[in-house]
Structure formats: C-alpha cells, structure tokens
Amino acid sequence: MSGAELISDLRARFGQAVLSEQSTNDAFPTLWIAPDAAPAVHRYLKHDVAKPFALLADLWAIDETARKHREGQPPSGITIASHLISLGRNADIVLKCPLDAKAPRATSIASVYPNADWYEREAFDLFGVHFDGRHDHRRILLPPLWEGHPLRKDQPARATEKPPFVMTAARFDAEEKALMIDPEALGLPTERDGVELMILNYGPHSMATHGVFRVVLALDGEEIVAARPDIGFHHRGAEKMGERQSWHQFIPYTDRIDYLGGVISEMPYLQAVERLCGITVPDRAKTIRIMLSEIYRIMNHLLLYGTMAQDCGAMSPVFYMFTDRERGYRIIEAITGARMHPGWFRIGGVAADLPEGWDRLVREFLDWMPKRLDDYAGMVLGNEIFRGRTVGIAAYDTATALDWGITGPGLRATGCDWDLRKARPYGGYENFEFEVPTGNNGDCYDRVLVRVEEMRQSLRIIRQCLDHMPSGPIKADHPLTTPPPRERMLHDIDTLIHHFVGVSWGPVVPAGEATGQAETVRGLTQYALVSDGATCSYRTRIRTPSFAHLQAVSAIAPGLTVADLVAYLGSIDYVMSDVDR
C-alpha cells in the first residue's frame, strides 16, 4: 500500500475526521486529523492496518500564532504532530491535530503508544497543551514551580528579555519542597503484599547514572518493584535556541545535543536544511561526512565498552580504550581542528578539504583497531564476571522496544536489523558495503555485543572511504550554500555582497517543512524543521534516542536488583544532554 493508498484508506474509514493533506518537503505524507479522532486513527495505524506503524518516533507541538506561511493548512493556534514509522513498509506518516491557541487541548494517545507519555508531558511543559485522558500533567524538563511555557512564541528567548532573577529565601524553600519525592504523585507503590516498600532516590549524583539524572525506586529488599526516571537537570533550551540562531549558526549546537557523537549529530539537521533549500551535496563532501561520522561512532562505542566494563567491576579496559580513542581524535583534529565538537559540516558540504597526510593517519588507525578489538573480546566479552552481570539482565523483545520508541543498538539487540543506513540510505551510505549486527536476547550483553560488532563495520566503511575517496568540490554550487565557495564571491561586487549578507545575517531558507533522519551513535536522531522564509528556523524539533530510551526504564527495571540496574543503565548508552536538550 503506497502513501496515497493509505491516505485514501484513512479517508474512507474516518471520513470527516481526516481534515486535509499537507504538502511538505518530505517524501512521506502529512495528514491533518480532528483532535478527538487521534486515538482511533493511531490505534488503526498501529494495530489494524497491514504492516502496521509500530513505532511512534516522535510527538511534538508547534505554536502557529506568529507563522506567516501556512498555505493549504487548516486554522490552528497550537499544532500537535506525531511521527509514525512502519518498519515492515519502511514508510513514515505524520499526523497533525489543530488546537486552540489560548487553551490547547488534545486527546492522549499514550494508551496506544506507551512512549507517548513523556512526549505529551513535554508538550504540556513547553507549550501548555493539556491531554484529555491523562492522569499526569507534571512538568518533565522544567522545575515544578516554573511559570509559563517557554516554547510559546510570546515567551522570551533570552534571559536579558526577562526581569532579573532573584532567589529569595522563601522561594528557595518552596523550590526545595517541590522537589521532594511524593510516591503518590509519581505513581509509586508504597507496599506489596502487606510489606512496606523502601523508596530510594537513586541519583542524580551517583556515578552509575552517567550524568545528572535520578531514578526514584520502590524496593522490596534488593528487588525493584517500580522505577520512575526524573530528568530535566541538563535542559538548556536547545529548541528555543534554534528559533533565534541563523540556520548556519545553529550547526555547533547540534554537536552539543549528543556531546559524544561529534559531527554525526550534524547530519540530520543539515539533511533537513538542505532539503528545504533544494541543495544536492557533492560526492566528495558526502564521503568525508560519512568517514568522520563513522570515526565518531567508534569513539562513542569505545567509551561505552570501557565504562560498561567498569560498571561491572573491571577497571583496566576503559584506560586501554581511551588510548584507542586518542588515535581517533588525532584524525579528527588533523581534519577539523577540533576534537569533540567540531561544528564542521556546512549547509551544502563541509568546512574545508582534507589536509595533506589524512590518509596516512586513517590507514594507521584502521591497521591498529582490529587487533585491539580482538584483545578486548577476551578481556570483557569473555570475562565470566562481565557475562554474569549482563547475560539475561534487563532483556526485552522487539515489540517492547518499539512500544517504547527504542531504536539503534538497543533495538537491534533484540534481533531486529533496522538501521537507517541500510533501510533508507542517506548522505551516500548507499555506496558502501557493510552488515547490520544484531543480537538474539535483547539483554545487556547483546546491547554491548552489537556495538562491538558495529565498530568492526564502521572500520569497514572507513576503509572504503579511504580507498575510494572521490575527487571534486567539497561544497555544493548553490546560492544557499553557507558559507559559499570562495570562488563564488571574488568576481564582482554582487557576489561579494551576497557572501556578506549570507554570512552576517544568514541565508534566507524558503518557507516549508522538512525532516532529517540519521542513524547516530545511539539510534534514530531526527530534526523536524519549519521555515517561515526567514534567516532562522520558525520551529526546530529535535528527536533524540536517549529521551526515548530512558523512558523505557520504568517498564524494564521492575524485577531487577539495584546492581542489575547499574548494568542496565550502562547498556542503554544514553547521554543526558541528548535526553534534556
């Protein structure tokens, strides 16, 4: 069934509840539906349609009140959008519901897609959208006593636009009291079989939480009866920043969403911008992007490998692996001039060509790593203590993973081979040969094993980049390429002015909507951008894998021990900046 056939099917089944189809820059359909029909439409797409849309990739809101270009869309003050993916069809669909701006109310779909829970809380927190059918409208990223909903267009983007912040003694006491654990508000049981449960605040300063994040646990002895993750400590308004920075200036911010992923996190953002602009990236730039992305994938997975061993009691591996990571960073430094956050991709290409001697550094790295991975297999994967701490621990199947929005290695560990680089190749990946590693049991051990095998496949991809690096330009010959190639600006005053305006104010991107998706180090990272024909984004929606993966803790942790939880959290491989944005 094609996208057009699916829309015809939905129109026939739901009649006037299907309001209209919206034209976007994406290849998949976007459909407006009545808010009260949302649960029924989502339920049909998940359970009843052939090759169902089992994955709710994202759910977000858009404040339409200041938008100028809404041609072909129904009236809406606040829009709720949900992005669904069918792995069987390898297809997507976006459903939108128009809401009132003053008192936005939608209908919850958490009973259909369990992972909608946190996304709906986020839409309430940042936009003030109330969801009928929900019992929990607590904030999720902001403090409980925060006033207002900051992603609304009437809310300032800078602290200098607000009155000075003053923390009085009374306010300090109120804020501290609001953060106290209330088991009833969290939905935590306080007893089981007549036995009182211990409520344990795990984090946010525990080394095992790998960042500023806490889990509130209800314990019966060492057994976890219930778990409630608490996030938001690292929130810094990245999506709001996307509305005030130019399209070009926002690139460095994408590195800091997942601060261990480096340039790999720039890929989905630039895909969306380039789709809006109609830019085709040259082959040499594509190959350079892929090579650097795969180096960063190895850097990340080595860190996970070492710290996971450390969480399970082995100290030595992480120090050996930092030596390997340093070799990778030598390549990154030589090419980009930076290490963790290069901000090096550009709209239409990359910042500069490869330096002299890059191939020698890459070849040395490729010759070095396979033997090291062989050594670590015996040191970690074959270690009896490590296996005892990870085999059979925190296991889940593919259906559970999809219910909770788990992608990347966490999904592939269940035996599902869905990888965007293979399923829907982007940015030149269609030109490379590599395998998609999978596990069998979906446990902590398999999640580590999949990442280890992914490193070997990344080495394979990098070697193909080394052996078959195309010649040619590193930036697209397009008016909106930013900054434009120097040869476009040195001819006359007109080209010089175009360069000056494009760099100082930023390129004016045509009005429209576009989505960029990438298989980043943790899973599906997605940018849904709305342009209103200006020098900056009207709405920058960032879908991160870590946000979805941490939400699943509440479903998977019960039945584990506290020691098991340490291994489980380590195997998720989340980054708190990726969660909180």
UniProtKB/Swiss-Prot annotation:
GO molecular function: NAD binding; NADH dehydrogenase (ubiquinone) activity; NADH:ubiquinone reductase (non-electrogenic) activity; quinone binding
First-listed, main subcellular location of the protein, grouped into a coarse class: membrane
Cellular compartments annotated: Cell inner membrane
SUPFAM superfamilies, per the entry: HydB/Nqo4-like, Nqo5-like
GO cellular component: NADH dehydrogenase complex; plasma membrane
EC number: 7.1.1.-
Residue numbers spanned by region NADH dehydrogenase I subunit D: 196-581
UniProt keyword Cell inner membrane, yes or no: yes
Enzyme class: translocase
Annotated region (NADH dehydrogenase I subunit C), positions in chain: 1-172
UniProt KW Translocase keyword: yes
Subunit structure: NDH-1 is composed of 13 different subunits. Subunits NuoB, CD, E, F, and G constitute the peripheral sector of the complex.
Protein family per UniProt: In the N-terminal section; belongs to the complex I 30 kDa subunit family. In the C-terminal section; belongs to the complex I 49 kDa subunit family.
Annotated function: NDH-1 shuttles electrons from NADH, via FMN and iron-sulfur (Fe-S) centers, to quinones in the respiratory chain. The immediate electron acceptor for the enzyme in this species is believed to be ubiquinone. Couples the redox reaction to proton translocation (for every two electrons transferred, four hydrogen ions are translocated across the cytoplasmic membrane), and thus conserves the redox energy in a proton gradient.
Name under which the protein is recorded: NADH-quinone oxidoreductase subunit C/D
Organism (species): Rhodopseudomonas palustris (strain BisA53)
